[in-house]
Amino acid sequence: MPELPEVEVTRRGLAPAIVGRSVTAVNVRTPKLREPLQDLAALLPGLTLEHLERRAKYLIWTFRSAAGEKRWLLTHMGMSGSWRIWSLPAPSAHKHDHADIVFGDVLVRYTDPRRFGSILFMTTDPRKSLPLTKLGCEPWDPTLTADRFYTELQKTHRSIKDCLLYTSDAADD
């Protein structure tokens, strides 16, 4: 499973190649991953990617339309998913390549052999709705002090390991 550090590495790898660029095409080859995929081929083209950030193990893609409206993709790589960058022409898609997002001469491909990942198109900020609102603070959050951590531990009878893995205490879902 891609853990938080791998998701951050993915974000850092994707962002320089695609932030500031407009979506020119989308190809979805699988109608359903963990959840049904919306018609991304109709929803994304023409939108410009403004920002790509990570929250826990989610990638938040912030787009803006020509009219100035914001739209988002909330993606999770599940157990075995990955995002890859290709210069066009890209290699032919294989069995587990489920979605391509084209930004001019750059293609970003989502691959997931186990199909446990998700790609959700949203018209509201995903940081203000589930599942992100139930997550705890990030590991590098300056508000996560030793005193705060100790106070949170006093509220539970779980082991420290369970607290670290429990997503409402630490952002690692």
How would you describe each model-predicted region?
Residues 1-108:
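A cross-family signal for N-terminal binding/gating loops and helix N-caps
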